[in-house]
Amino acid sequence: MEGHVKRPMNAFMVWSRGERHKLAQQNPSMQNTEISKQLGCRWKSLTEAEKRPFFQEAQRLKTLHREKYPNYKYQPHRRAKVSQRSGILQPRVASTKLYNLLQWDRNPHAITYRQDWSRAAHLYSKNQQSFYLQPVDIPTGHPQQQQQQFHNHHQQKQQFHDHHQQKQQFHDHHQQQQQFHDHQQQQQQFHDHQQQKQQFHDHQQQQQQFHDHHHQQQQQQFHDHHHHQQQQQQFHDHHQQKQQFHDHHQQQQQQQFHDHPQQQQQFHDHPQQKQQFHDHHHHQQQKQQFHDHHQQKQQFHDHHQQQQQFHDHQQQQQQQQFHDQQLTYLLTADITGEHTPYQEHLSKALWLAVS
């Protein structure tokens, strides 16, 4: 039809466009009805991940169609007007073909192409224009001829009634297919909306992750910079301390040199003073070693005392446990009334230990 703008294909049409051709090549004798049924079942068995590329392609085609036809509005094909002349009659062959077209799968998950419906409508219109009923004359002549004419007229009326019913079924089925197609488009729009929401949510998460990562990097850089500044400050302070110590040492040396020139002269003139200084230093080292040795001995003595105390404490605990066990044994014997010489001896020993 010239000037008619086709609706954009949905996801199922995009997928079945190639699958229908493959299935028809693999099974040349398969009817279009059976092909449509199998395509519908296969599409229903696909997962969301497998359907996603076809939904995306359908969305792309829909966007291109909207850009190409911005003022497009869906207008279903108008049903061809049926002539009210009593002479129109569809032949049995055409009626059978149209009936086969009308018996397409009514499963809501199976979709047939609008081209098939266009062919059916064209066939129906062509048959209407090609066949006519003969006008019925008033019965005259022989009674058998009148009865035959009446019978033919009754058959023509029955055929016209059947044709009208087929027409109504075709119209109802076309409306059902259109409603299902609209439902598919609504599902497609809902799926696209869900995808857009998911993409927006993912974009928000990516922005949040980028913001968190950037914030962490800034914090790490600030921490590193602060640590570097602290190290520089410590190095500077240490350098200042070294410089102060060096200056103080030089001042002390200069002061000592200035205050005791005679001592320096005597130290230089008398090597014995050097020997005395060396002996004094050696004596100080020996004293320090003796002090350290004494501390080690004291620590060893303290450790020995601690071990002795621990050993005495363990012995006391063992004796106390043994005493408690013997006392329990005696109490049990008193309760049960059993007495042995060993129990009497043990009782006397415990009495002496307690007293």
Swiss-Prot record:
Location of the protein in the cell: Nucleus speckle; Cytoplasm; Nucleus
One MF term in the entry's GO annotations: DNA-binding transcription activator activity, RNA polymerase II-specific
Signal peptide: none
GO terms, biological process: cell differentiation; positive regulation of gene expression; sex differentiation
Source species, domain of life: Eukaryota
Entry keyword annotation includes Transcription regulation: yes
DNA-binding segment(s): 5-73
Keywords, comma-separated and alphabetical: Acetylation, Activator, Calmodulin-binding, Cytoplasm, Differentiation, DNA-binding, Nucleus, Repeat, Sexual differentiation, Transcription, Transcription regulation
One cellular component term from this protein's GO annotations in UniProt: nuclear speck
InterPro entries per record: HMG_box_dom, HMG_box_dom_sf, SRY-related_HMG-box_TF-like
Region of interest (Disordered), ranges: 135-322
Post-translational modifications: Acetylation of Lys-81 contributes to its nuclear localization and enhances its interaction with KPNB1. Deacetylated by HDAC3.
Function: Transcriptional regulator that controls a genetic switch in male development. It is necessary and sufficient for initiating male sex determination by directing the development of supporting cell precursors (pre-Sertoli cells) as Sertoli rather than granulosa cells. Involved in different aspects of gene regulation including promoter activation or repression. Binds to the DNA consensus sequence 5'-[AT]AACAA[AT]-3'. SRY HMG box recognizes DNA by partial intercalation in the minor groove and promotes DNA bending. Also involved in pre-mRNA splicing.
Domain notes: The Gln- and His-rich domain may mediate protein-protein interactions.
Subunit record text: Interacts with CALM, EP300, HDAC3, KPNB1, ZNF208 isoform KRAB-O, PARP1, SLC9A3R2 and WT1. The interaction with EP300 modulates its DNA-binding activity. The interaction with KPNB1 is sensitive to dissociation by Ran in the GTP-bound form. Interaction with PARP1 impaired its DNA-binding activity.
Family: Belongs to the SRY family.
Protein name, as recorded: Sex-determining region Y protein
Source organism (scientific name): Mus spretus
